[in-house]
């Protein structure tokens, strides 16, 4: 996804003074949020939470990631885009439908990553944006999108995730690469989405070169630097990394953080979003997404 120099604590700026307006718009299209955890045993109260999130990718390590999460009963939030995959017709395609359905049954949470994995490149005049999708029919092309175009791509991913998982998508999104502008954030807020970044220590490094960033060093740095409240980000497969991150790092990272007293929570429990989501879930007669 190309985070590179964009590694920053965007999490501190995710909910602006327009949160009330964001909530009002969210109520117009969110389906009721489902409750009741599906993990085998009740999850303990989380005193030192970290928030593990996964963005889609080539899906080659997706089965392994699911197995580790299930084994350790770790709830996560998946941000979905229909990216090119090693097998099948895209990460949100029919080939992976059963995988997503299983994650929904396990009570993980889901949010938009833009359907076409659409990178923001620049703001243009007239509330428009230079966008370059890395998936879909226009992959690799620079497009001129208005607010409605961007919102449609956000909603398309949310709707597809709902179909695949049987769960309502959260009114959250992560821009590919974390690349945004204030104008893009405002555009997304106008159709009900709050942006989710990640914490500096939460950038787990799975898309960095394995020649310069070994799995052992990535694990060591994560265990050393992650703090309570951090949002962590990894991917369901990175094309460019020769030594895959998840098989070597995910399980020891989870175990190591738990041994240090950390616990895992969904973004549903994050203080920046929990109030918003609580108000959405309590509101009767909410309309469904168009």
Label the model's feature ranges.
Residues 37-142, 153-170, 256:
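Active-site beta->alpha N-cap acidic-glycine motif
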Residues 19-32:
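Bacterial N-terminal signal peptides
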Residues 179, 184-225, 262-273:
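His/Asp/Glu-enriched short active-site or ligand-binding loop at hydrolase and phosphoryl-transfer sites
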Residues 54-56, 78-83, 112-114, 175-177, ...:
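A cross-domain feature marking catalytic cores of carbohydrate-active enzymes
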Residues 37-44, 76, 86, 242-290:
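C-terminal domain-boundary segment and adjacent tail
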Residues 3-22:
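Bacterial N-terminal signal peptides that target proteins for export
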Residues 56-61, 81-95, 118-123, 172-182, ...:
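Acidic-and-aromatic substrate-binding clefts and catalytic sites of carbohydrate-active enzymes
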């Amino acid at each position: 996804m190309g985070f590179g120099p964009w590694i920053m604590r965007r999490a501190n700026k995710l909910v602006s003074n327009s949160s009330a307006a964001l909530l009002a718009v969210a109520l117009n299209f969110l389906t009721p949020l489902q409750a009741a955890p599906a993990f085998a045993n009740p999850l303990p109260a989380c005193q030192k939470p970290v928030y593990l999130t996964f963005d889609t990718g080539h899906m080659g390590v997706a089965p392994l990631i699911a197995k580790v999460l299930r084994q350790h009963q770790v709830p996560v939030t998946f941000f979905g885009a229909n990216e090119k995959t090693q097998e099948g017709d895209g990460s949100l395609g029919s080939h992976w439908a059963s995988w997503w359905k299983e994650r929904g049954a396990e009570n993980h949470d889901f949010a938009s990553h833009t359907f076409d994995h659409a990178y923001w490149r620049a703001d243009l005049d007239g509330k428009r944006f230079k966008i370059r999708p890395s998936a879909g029919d226009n992959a690799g092309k620079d497009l001129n999108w208005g607010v409605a175009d961007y919102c449609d791509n956000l909603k398309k991913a949310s709707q597809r995730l709902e179909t695949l998982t049987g769960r309502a998508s959260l009114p959250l999104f992560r821009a590919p690469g974390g690349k945004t502008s204030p104008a893009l954030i405002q555009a997304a807020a106008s159709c009900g989405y709050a942006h989710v970044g990640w914490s500096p220590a939460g950038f787990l490094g799975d898309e960095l070169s394995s020649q310069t960033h070994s799995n052992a060093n990535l694990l060591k740095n994560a265990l050393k630097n992650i703090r309570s409240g951090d949002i962590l980000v990894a991917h369901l497969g990175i094309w460019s990394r020769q030594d895959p991150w998840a098989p070597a790092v995910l399980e020891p990272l989870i175990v190591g953080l738990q041994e240090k007293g950390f616990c895992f929570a969904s973004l549903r429990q994050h203080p920046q979003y929990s109030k918003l989501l609580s108000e959405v879930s309590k509101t009767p007669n909410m309309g469904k997404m168009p």
